[in-house]
């Protein structure tokens, strides 16, 4: 022990003659240096512990405050306020329900982002205060004596390292290269660890483990793409590279009147065979999606705008475990979230805007005469079919399907107007049918009334107005009138009661005035009194005019 202390004093520049006299003083100096350094370390550790303790208490307190301040207003399933709100939303149509839930999802996402930013800002402030405390402890001004002692100790450490390095170099000549490599790595690791405090190393390990942790339901909803998002950005120049790796909620069918959805990950963008419309936008974009190891291509119009439910996430997680696939990490989710933000903030150049417009025009281009174009394509298809060219037939079929889609989109407004006109025509036809039925009922009632009046009135021969006598009717009256009626558009026999009940329904097949006179039937003028009307009705009933009216074709053209 004495030899080691002498060596230390010799390294410090003290002669051998002064060793005995100055040994006590050297011991005191060395003890002072070690004690001063230990005191500084203790002070630094005390400051660090105090900062960590205060920071930890502050973090717990701040998290509680932030949890209360940024409280999610939709506590029920993360989408509804309460049971009444849930019943109200579920009673809406699917479009209205998805729109409201999409708005609530964005509201919750913004609220969570504000909460995370507030927590991070508070943590950064706490770390800054802790670093300031440690820095103030280290930067405490030293006295000249303490500074000299520290310089001597530094010099001693340097010389010891040089001597140990020489001894190591001598020993390494007899050792293997593998052991040298391991020792070098260990020394490098030890040197690197000396430059970092244990607390920082623990924070670094904790951060790495947190980044490599599996993503949860909240993380996947952060990088979920809805139908509205895809329809808005599907012509964007960096759309394909951005959405690859994101997640979508796909509707695959219905069960018991409810939609069945699957959580899928987008692996690529494909082009569909024919264009289709998504929220009024014409496109040919299709998504290649994976659910576990199952792969399928979906059109954009089957995507849902609602967030993933817990059932969707659990089923997808079970499928990933069953297929022995690794879950995406939180670090991956953060990268995709940054990509989505970059795409939303991307500024398009003039050339990119022109390309987007040209792509939309190319899809929405409609021929001037769609019918003629379809006829021409069908003729080409028939010729290709006869020639046995299956590829050309398939190509022409795709063109015909495209024309059908375009014609449906271009004629949407006109078809709507035609539908309205068809409804008006149908309403008019029903009204005309009702009016005709009522007119027939009135005629039947009038006929029954006239028949009843004819049976109740005594049989008396009418007197002719022209001759004042009662002419005898010819036996062949009914036969001649009913068998060979002649039309006279200017003059006809009109019954006053029928004219009053149905003025628009005038019979066409009535005997002419000359024919009636030739057969000996007296024709009176239009009666002016009620007695004349009754007399004429009685005369018509007696002479069989009812039979004539029953055989008359009114000739009314009504479109039903």
Swiss-Prot record:
Ranges of compositional bias, category Basic and acidic residues: 148-171, 440-449
The Plus3 domain, residue ranges: 214-345
Keyword annotations: Activator, Coiled coil, Nucleus, Phosphoprotein, Transcription, Transcription regulation
Coiled-coil stretches: 387-456
Any GO BP annotation: transcription elongation by RNA polymerase II
Quaternary state and interactors: Component of the PAF1 complex.
Annotated protein name in UniProt: RNA polymerase-associated protein C651.09c
Lineage of the species this protein comes from: Eukaryota, Fungi, Dikarya, Ascomycota, Taphrinomycotina
